[in-house]
Amino acid sequence: AAGANDRIWNSLQKLCESSPDVFLRYFANVAIQTACEAWLGPNYQMTAQVNLVHPGGDAQQAHRDYHLGFQTAEVSALYPSHVHELSPALTLQGAIAHCDMPIESGPTKLLPFSQTYLPGYAAWRREDFRETFEAHYVQLPLSKGDALFFSPAVFHGAGSNVSSNIHRMANLLQVSS
């Protein structure tokens, strides 16, 4: 629905500049560090965007993210297979719930094990893949403060916010080696 989604782009830098103490407490969290270092090793870099989905906000279509996830299928197909295999290992996706997110508020839908499908960066726009995603995704309710981390190659997408009063807010993290 139009107007059902708001973002604060580059929220990491904006928080650091406006409230350094809060920034340090938030991002020095040992859980964030542990997840990031387990996936990427030390010296990772992070970007963040706060995403707010109001009641009535539509679901996203299933997709993959960085690095190849934002290319067209034709451009993705130009990359050799080893890039498709290695690209997801360079980034970790994360979301930190800033409110309770029952299923009706539309937390992230995930297709387990879809990250193992090597041609997925070129194929995720296909209707048969979208149908498979919708038939088999899992979705977890989150409590305020919960964090969800996953490979950018996992087919995923935000669910519909069918609630009448939950303004679903999450801090979306992209962490790179």
Model regions: which residues?
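Non-heme Fe(II)-dependent double-stranded beta-helix
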Residues: 1-74
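Catalytic micro-motifs at enzyme active sites that drive phosphoryl/nucleotidyl and oxygen chemistry
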Residues: 37, 80-84
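Residues that flank catalytic or metal-binding motifs in active/ligand-binding sites
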Residues: 47-48, 90, 104-106, 167-169
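A structural signal for short, well-ordered beta-strand segments
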Residues: 48-50, 94-96, 171-175
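Short secondary-structure boundary/capping segments
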Residues: 62-67, 110-113, 164-167
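Short Pro/Gly-enriched beta-strand edge/turn motifs at strand-loop
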Residues: 74-80
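Double-stranded beta-helix
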Residues: 78, 87-159
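Non-heme Fe(II)/2-oxoglutarate
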Residues: 123-125, 154-155, 159-177
